[in-house]
Amino acid sequence: MSWEIVIGLEVHVQLNTASKLFSGSKLSTGAEPNTQASLVDLGLPGTLPVVNREAVRKAALFGLAIDADICRHSVFERKNYFYPDLPKGYQTTQLAEPIVGAGTVEIQLDNGEKKSIRIHHAHLEEDAGKSLHEDFHGMTGIDLNRAGTPLIEIVSEPDMANAEEAVAFARKLHAIVTSIGICDGDMSQGNMRFDVNISVRKPGEPLGTRTETKNLNSFRFMEKAIALEVERQIDVLEDGGEIVQETRLYNGDTHTARSMRSKEDANDYRYFPCPDLLPVAITDADIEELKAAMPELPDSRKARFTNDYQLSEYDADLLSGSIATAAFFEAAAKSGGDAKLAANWVMGELAAKLNAEEKSITDSPVSAEQLGQLIARLKDGTISSKIAKQVFEACWAGEGNPDEIIEAKGLKQMSDTGELEKIVDDIIANNAAQADDYRNSDDAKKKKKIGFFVGQAMKATQGKANPQQLNKLLQEKLQ
């Protein structure tokens, strides 16, 4: 029985301003609990909020990056609800007139297919505090350092049909907000958090009842949480049950989800305009200034990589998604003199090592310049591909630059044709039966059987033989 999956995302992006949205309190990761909360953040009587100009600028910059309408008369409202980490009893946010209107984000899937995901709007709002459950012996502690932190909440239309599309959309948003410099993008620190709205239906039927899975902070968890919730909803419906509109919480450690509460509608929050804040006015001059300051966007960077470096669209898409990865690749390509080799090494050996040790590219023990030097030695024939991997491992371990490692370990390819010719003659003489078998084979079989002699020669030279030179010699000698 076929089912259609319908997915929409709400993405909370923490803006990297110096201070909070409505107060002068500093934004500080790792500070002692409740040391970065001002009287304004606590909502004490007599305090008045003041809008952070830089937060408004960053929100509008995001809107321009997705080609959205920018509201010239944006209004803040109070969203009323009670929760222990919400000291004021309301959240200052936007509903009727958000700062960013409708826009679009284009994603590319693994099969090369492209799809446009519509953005309904993005609004500015303040974050709540944080509940602390450890070390309180049956009680919950409240840390209000995060209260008042500036966020933009990006609300998509329900345009995604599977987990792959949702993750691709989330990754693209991450690439955009980090590229334009409005968010640090550290998922482990909660710089981006994803709420996923999911429903299923039979083809042609109206939208089903949706659930919301909250506060996913990694792309991997998002993919797993979507698969889990889709399976749950289909099982419920196929058993004759009904989906309850609710908010659910996913546990990445156990790959389980539980119901948190029934899902509210906007009316339940009794929104009304914030009486303490004037509307935010954005002028044509403000917009033109932001457009002039717009950094390179991921799609523009991708196009440049395909045009300037002749990379495939797939490779360019992977390398342009992260500004740090893009910068590393370009530096390595410039240093090594070969963009394609640089792309292969960044996406291959380097990415594998970083993933294995759970490091980001900014923490790579091998610098872009060192990788470029390795590529240059590979390109000029100083070392073979096999030896290059050995040099890379030594460089990763901190044994020096590639040139130093190659020299210290004697890893240069054999450039003496006479010496290599003698080794080839010895191998053929010591393997006469295999040589005769090769000579009596057709061309197709010869291509396979010559591999035996190549392997023997590489073993004899400890991998230092030039593969092209070796193949040519073997073909001549085995005639």
Swiss-Prot record:
<dbReference type="InterPro" id="IPR018027">
    <property type="entry name" value="Asn/Gln_amidotransferase"/>
</dbReference>
<protein>
    <recommendedName>
        <fullName>Aspartyl/glutamyl-tRNA(Asn/Gln) amidotransferase subunit B</fullName>
        <ecNumber>6.3.5.-</ecNumber>
    </recommendedName>
</protein>
<dbReference type="InterPro" id="IPR006075">
    <property type="entry name" value="Asn/Gln-tRNA_Trfase_suB/E_cat"/>
</dbReference>
<dbReference type="GO" id="GO:0050566">
    <property type="term" value="F:asparaginyl-tRNA synthase (glutamine-hydrolyzing) activity"/>
</dbReference>
<keyword id="KW-0648">Protein biosynthesis</keyword>
<comment type="subunit">
    <text>Heterotrimer of A, B and C subunits.</text>
</comment>
<dbReference type="GO" id="GO:0050567">
    <property type="term" value="F:glutaminyl-tRNA synthase (glutamine-hydrolyzing) activity"/>
</dbReference>
<dbReference type="GO" id="GO:0070681">
    <property type="term" value="P:glutaminyl-tRNAGln biosynthesis via transamidation"/>
</dbReference>
<comment type="similarity">
    <text>Belongs to the GatB/GatE family. GatB subfamily.</text>
</comment>
<dbReference type="InterPro" id="IPR014746">
    <property type="entry name" value="Gln_synth/guanido_kin_cat_dom"/>
</dbReference>
<dbReference type="InterPro" id="IPR017959">
    <property type="entry name" value="Asn/Gln-tRNA_amidoTrfase_suB/E"/>
</dbReference>
<dbReference type="InterPro" id="IPR023168">
    <property type="entry name" value="GatB_Yqey_C_2"/>
</dbReference>
<dbReference type="InterPro" id="IPR017958">
    <property type="entry name" value="Gln-tRNA_amidoTrfase_suB_CS"/>
</dbReference>
<keyword id="KW-0067">ATP-binding</keyword>
<dbReference type="InterPro" id="IPR042114">
    <property type="entry name" value="GatB_C_1"/>
</dbReference>
<dbReference type="Pfam" id="PF02934">
    <property type="entry name" value="GatB_N"/>
</dbReference>
<keyword id="KW-0547">Nucleotide-binding</keyword>
<comment type="function">
    <text>Allows the formation of correctly charged Asn-tRNA(Asn) or Gln-tRNA(Gln) through the transamidation of misacylated Asp-tRNA(Asn) or Glu-tRNA(Gln) in organisms which lack either or both of asparaginyl-tRNA or glutaminyl-tRNA synthetases. The reaction takes place in the presence of glutamine and ATP through an activated phospho-Asp-tRNA(Asn) or phospho-Glu-tRNA(Gln).</text>
</comment>
<dbReference type="GO" id="GO:0006412">
    <property type="term" value="P:translation"/>
</dbReference>
<dbReference type="InterPro" id="IPR004413">
    <property type="entry name" value="GatB"/>
</dbReference>
<keyword id="KW-0436">Ligase</keyword>
<dbReference type="Pfam" id="PF02637">
    <property type="entry name" value="GatB_Yqey"/>
</dbReference>
<dbReference type="GO" id="GO:0005524">
    <property type="term" value="F:ATP binding"/>
</dbReference>
<dbReference type="InterPro" id="IPR003789">
    <property type="entry name" value="Asn/Gln_tRNA_amidoTrase-B-like"/>
</dbReference>
